[in-house]
């Protein structure tokens, strides 16, 4: 039977053309009034998935 893509992971992580895994930063959804502007600016954009997690994430995405 074919392996299914883990949809929760697929919604959160994008694969770049070179095969890198990118994810959104945490802590920027709500309760932003109490966080300094400096912190919220730093949390903009995307970040690479941790090296320790890449193998597991690729398997969930069906790219292992």
From Swiss-Prot:
GO terms for biological process: translation. The keyword Ribosomal protein applies. One of its GO terms (cellular component) is cytosolic large ribosomal subunit. Signal peptide: none annotated. NCBIfam families: rpmI_bact. PANTHER family: 54S RIBOSOMAL PROTEIN BL35M, LARGE RIBOSOMAL SUBUNIT PROTEIN BL35M. This is Large ribosomal subunit protein bL35. It comes from Corynebacterium aurimucosum (strain ATCC 700975 / DSM 44827 / CIP 107346 / CN-1) (Corynebacterium nigricans). The gene is rpmI.
